Amino acid sequence: MKSKRLMRPDSLRGMAGSTYDGIKKISRSRTKKVEQYTKEECARLRKAFGYSYEEYHDSIRTMALNGTEGITSMGVDTPLAALSNKQPLLFSYFKQRFAQVTNPPIDAVREKIVTNTSVYIGKEGNILKEQPENCQVLKVNNPILSDTDLLKIKGVRQPGLYPAEVMITCMKHMSLKIALERLFIEVDRVYKDGASILILTDRGVDETHVAIPSLLAVSAVHHYLVRTKKSTVMPIILESAEPREVHHFATLLGYGASAVNPYLAHETIREMVEDGLLEKDYYAAVHDYDEAILGGIVKIASKMGISTIQSYQGSQIFEAVGISKEVIDPYFTHTLSRVGGITMKEIEEDVELRHSQAFDPLGRKTDLTLESVGRHSFRSQGEHHRYNPATIHLLQQSVWQDDYTMFQEYTGQIDKEETGYLRSLMDFRYPKEGVPIEEVESVDSIVRRFKTGAMSYGSISQEAHEALAVAMNKIHGKSNSGEGGESPERLLTKGTKDDRCSAIKQVASDVWCHQPLSGKRRRDSNQDGSGGKAGRRRPPAGKESVSVDCKNSVFYSRRESDFPAAAP
């Protein structure tokens, strides 16, 4: 090759001629050679991997049926994973991060033309040297692999493409640290044997073998390959029964996996089709489920301004909440973790507990019924909810009856909450000698710094939205209009007894129009990265009303000169 410029893989493919097949595109096809499980085996595996009834019915079934994620209410009032007594999966300890101000997010729906979900599996090659060997990779349009896709990859026999399987299971009661060290030794072995595609699989869980948490295994192997300078020559494919929700797949890709095959989720869909819970073709249902997962990952990546799955892989755009440095430093290196938390011992205990619920240590018959954990909706024996029927009843009755004593009882119950939030674990330190009263700031001075959160008119109701503005204006605080703006009529109430004009006017990122400000605000708030996006089709039909007014709307500009000057 005479040219010294860097070239695209498809250009190199043409130059390679008949010597190399170039990029191998994996298309979906149907085969009967995929390993299948009986209903009892599926039920036992679901129990061993901690599936819940909500995940079975509301998550997997919904995505397989509709091809999109299920719609749930905003807000989380359940405990953090580290404070929960329901043994949450390791995925739950990682929180997604999103762009704020410095790196504006993108709208993956309206800007679909710039998104790319394809991934290339194989040796990356030398980007500084043009050679046909750089094209010895597999092109996969969706990193969520069907069982048949993975079967094809396992059977690939092409120059430079040598897949090798490594088990991520270990003997029951074995230390996870020892299991991971053995895993590293096995990875080195297949590397020396010439493997260029590493397939981590947890098929083989039984009475005596437990699965290493898939996220721990993937991240540990990824960082081991990085430390030993092998990450560019041996990408990771995960074959696991554990992932089933969008967040699970996002963390796996973010911590180094190139593709994931959720075989138990697919087997669960097969079972639903056979039992009549899904009235559609099995292959269509699996395809829709995989597409729903992919769409969710694209949405998550877009919050960071990332438009391609390849850029998202290995990016580690997560913050760990409730994991100790003993786990973070060696296995999730460079992950942000501001507080300590669980160690390898607690992770082992959770794995052992879930396994014992599926395979009784004494050989007795086990109850394989999925537990209704109640993470999305309250259950009497389920996950703790800060706002439960008891507290909501007190709040409603205190307001309806105008009973301040009952309201104090409500706030007392909220203050007594001992689980769920980090702040509930902290208390004030009071000096023994007290504080001179002249050094104490007055209540009137303190409340002037109070601000409400940015809650748009469409997210709550007219009464609640206006009540917040009136209340904050009376105590000289500041309410935030939210990205939906507010009616121009409310601007006319400024200075009156019931001033309904929000002190802070929020301007969203080119999503919603807003009324001219006309100096009627004390502060501006710019929002990026969250809120309802116009192309996502998420607003419930019942929230559409005649109050939506597009008249007198103006375009949003980032230039200061386009806005009227604020009142002095």
Model-flagged regions — what are they?
Residues 242-256:
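Catalytic cores of alpha/beta
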